[in-house]
Amino acid sequence: MLKMNLANLQLFAHKKGGGSTSNGRDSQAKRLGAKAADGQTVSGGSILYRQRGTHIYPGVNVGRGGDDTLFAKVEGVVRFERKGRDKKQVSVYPVAK
């Protein structure tokens, strides 16, 4: 009896298959930035500016939340101002009735 050597023949693809790309993802926009304009009248508790970190600092009658959001403490008119040479702040000045 003749013994035959059977080769273990495996065929591989010569092109990678049409798999999914490793891109194609993005995070949701966080809607940061100014929520009230300079000169606008706002009520107490209104959000003035949403931010990460302190791009803008709180001024008169403005508080800073845990996520650095700036909000009005009293009803009044919003003013964006300079704070020194290279910083900005937002203040709320009450209007006389």
UniProtKB/Swiss-Prot annotation:
Q: What GO biological process, any one, is recorded here?
A: translation
| Gene Ontology terms, MF aspect | structural constituent of ribosome
Which Pfam families does UniProt cross-reference here?
A: Ribosomal_L27
**Chain intervals for the UniProt region annotation (Disordered):** 14-37
What family does the entry list?
A: Belongs to the bacterial ribosomal protein bL27 family.
For this protein, the record's NCBIfam families field holds: L27
Protein name per the record: Large ribosomal subunit protein bL27
